[in-house]
Amino acid sequence: MDASADRKSNEINVTMEEPIRILMLFTIMNRGGAETMVMNYYRHIDRNRVQFDFMVHRQERGAYDDEIEAMGGKIYRMIPLHPFTFNTYRKQISDFFDQHPEYRIIHGHCSESGYFVYREAAGRRVPVIIAHAHNAHALFDTKWLFRTYFKHTMRPYLTQGFTCGKEAARWLFGNELGKKAILQRNAIDTFLYRFDEAVRLEVRQELHLSKDVTVVGHVGRFNRQKNHEFLLEVFHKYVQEFNPTAHLLLVGTGELQKAIQKKVQQFRLTDQVHLLGGRPDVNRLLQAMDLFLFPSFMEGLSVSMV
């Protein structure tokens, strides 16, 4: 995060006629924690002065795409980043900046995967390049080596780090640079989450759940990080040994959804586990729950827990 000194001469020009446009980096704008946090801020900023545009890495549309475009944001679609696409992706990023030299602020939310964008932007003397730490560490898998390499080599290209917490900053930026990261709160609109008995009963009626039954809940992507398999094992044991009429609400989508559905069938819990998909009304669904479980392998500061 020491590149800012070399770019002082390349200042951001602010005019009253056009808003400052910030380029946000994401995989896809679905209803994940980081995505939802950015959208919470996006809805409340003065978009006549500051606009968010989004570089995503999936061709399919995300859950927030319509809202982004309605608020004046632009969405640019890149190819997914994989080891076999590095050269093609690097060329695509170079072409993007050839076509869009107007971006003077880059804000990445895809951890070390923003490496190629950060490097290209630094080479073009973009004055503000931010990486945002959202997780405390990465799971060990086939991509771990690449993640570790990019995490270390991206740091000189950054002008600033943002983080949701100290552990997340230390993991992405290292001990020394992590201390300089700016803590940005994972904000929510607290008014929407105030308890309301009428909403609780209404949601339970919609889900065909009685007012007296115990409802356990979880909100999160269906991926390895969120540890749904263990969550189901815990719920299965809870039903068997303590509360045979309990229900479980699973809110989210993801690549492991079919595997989780199969696990539900194996446990013979089809009538008690409700896969609700990605929902825009999580604040309402939370009202129906008595217990919230969150057994993730890793988190920075979860928006679901906030």
Language-model region placement:
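Donor nucleotide-sugar binding/catalytic pocket of nucleotide-sugar-dependent glycosyltransferases
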Residues: 2-6, 156-199
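N-terminal strand-loop element at the rim of the active site
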Residues: 6-20, 24-32, 36-88, 255
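Short His-centered aromatic/hydrophobic patch
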Residues: 108-114, 133
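Nucleotide-activated donor-binding/catalytic signature segment of Leloir-type glycosyltransferases, i.e.
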Residues: 261-277
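A short helix/loop element that forms part of the nucleotide-sugar donor recognition site in Leloir-type
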Residues: 3-8, 93, 194-209, 265
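Aromatic "clamp/platform" in nucleotide-sugar-dependent glycosyltransferases that forms part
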Residues: 278, 297
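A conserved mid-protein helix/loop that constitutes part of the nucleotide-sugar donor-binding site
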Residues: 32-40, 214, 218-239, 255-261, ...
